[in-house]
Amino acid sequence: MENFKHLPEPFRIRVIEPVKRTTRAYREEAIIKSGMNPFLLDREDVFIDLLTDSGTGAVTQSMQAAMMRGDEAYSGSRSYYALAESVKNIFGYQYTIPTHQGRGAEQIYIPVLIKKREQEKGLDRSKMVAFSNYFFDTTQGHSQINGCTVRNVYIKEAFDTGVRYDFKGNFDLEGLERGIEEVGPNNVPYIVATITSNSAGGQPVSLANLKAMYSIAKKYDIPVVMDSARFAENAYFIKQREAEYKDWTIEQITRETYKYADMLAMSAKKDAMVPMGGLLCMKDDSFFDVYTECRTLCVVQEGFPTYGGLEGGAMERLAVGLYDGMNLDWLAYRIAQVQYLVDGLEEIGVVCQQAGGHAAFVDAGKLLPHIPADQFPAQALACELYKVAGIRAVEIGSFLLGRDPKTGKQLPCPAELLRLTIPRATYTQTHMDFIIEAFKHVKENAANIKGLTFTYEPKVLRHFTAKLKEV
């Protein structure tokens, strides 16, 4: 198998879901009704759904079987302890709080860390800034609604689609330390390391970079939270690209990675492969006070701390999914599938970010240079792709980034990207070929695609529910 051109799907398909075909006229009407926002389309009207890989893929037979062990006790569930044991074995973290998904963890830990910094270091809430290699949208949103400014400190190669670089997700370490000094260390409530960096194109962060970032954080006594949605994909890239770790297992690399954070927050709907679930975990006793405070908030916002909004069967499934998501053959196939799609798009002249872990990212700014950033070229491209082929994708650019909450001005975005997110074990190579062919048709009509403007704009996380029209 090692010498074959393409790696086949390393699984057998046992259950299928029929999908509906639609006409171009039907799709044009549907996208207009949705306010030119693919998030608001009905799933029944989508032929290939590349909106997200979050909870949209298949599960393994071992995960499905694990659900039968679910203990639905309100408190002290046996299934909770199975999940907590998986966390200890994989990440080395001693304290676990389950949540319904990643944002459930964020709404708990962010206010707790801000309060802790205020009480212990005299944080000035009017001056507080949190740093990341690049904040995920909901992490940014929860920070902002708690009054915290966010600052992304990424390397210059990160968003240059013409550059190939092994670890485009890396922190700009000089920029990080300079930023901390600028705002004052006591006004930095937390640093978030996002692995992989979703907004940069699913790009990995090297272990060397994480070590250096953590050293800076410890110098200023700032807590580090690992945003862990795609921890296994990041470990795979480290194995492939960081020579020191080429002979390490994914499990060993993962354990090493989590030495360089104090907490982890996870949407388990990605690399842990579950339809619903999240985690908030603390490494050791030095964050026991944070754990205690977060448990209290969990009761109010998610559920009792030993279920956190999840049924017992879902916790059992997650306990297994954390392991299944680290399977080396599975990861090799998944990364190869993304690479295949990127290669196919570039062969027809569609510029992409270098292949990352979970999606192909099309450079919409280059495909639609006539549409300015404030008319959202990647969102316009998403609408055209749906009209042409019934494919739903998602904008990662100015539309998602939003406005400065203090000034109301559009935040400058480093790139206008369209994310083609591949759900796990759901679509085959034939689907990838269809997507590539769809882009041939889109490219032929690119000059006629129009920009977009708002008819309704929410103040926070606008990309989920905003409505637009063509300019």
Swiss-Prot record:
Keyword Lyase in annotation: yes
Gene3D superfamilies in the cross-refs: Aspartate Aminotransferase, domain 1, Type I PLP-dependent aspartate aminotransferase-like (Major domain)
Reactions catalysed according to its record: L-tryptophan + H2O = indole + pyruvate + NH4(+)
Record keywords, A-Z: Acetylation, Lyase, Pyridoxal phosphate, Tryptophan catabolism
InterPro entries: ArAA_b-elim_lyase/Thr_aldolase, Beta-eliminating_lyase, PyrdxlP-dep_Trfase, PyrdxlP-dep_Trfase_major, PyrdxlP-dep_Trfase_small, TNase, Tryptophanase_CS
Pathway recorded for this protein: Amino-acid degradation; L-tryptophan degradation via pyruvate pathway; indole and pyruvate from L-tryptophan: step 1/1
Protein EC: 4.1.99.1
Modified sites of kind N6-(pyridoxal phosphate)lysine: K270
Residues annotated as transmembrane: none
Assembly with partners or alone: Homotetramer.
Family per record: Belongs to the beta-eliminating lyase family.
Protein name: Tryptophanase
Organism whose genome encodes this protein: Shigella boydii serotype 18 (strain CDC 3083-94 / BS512)
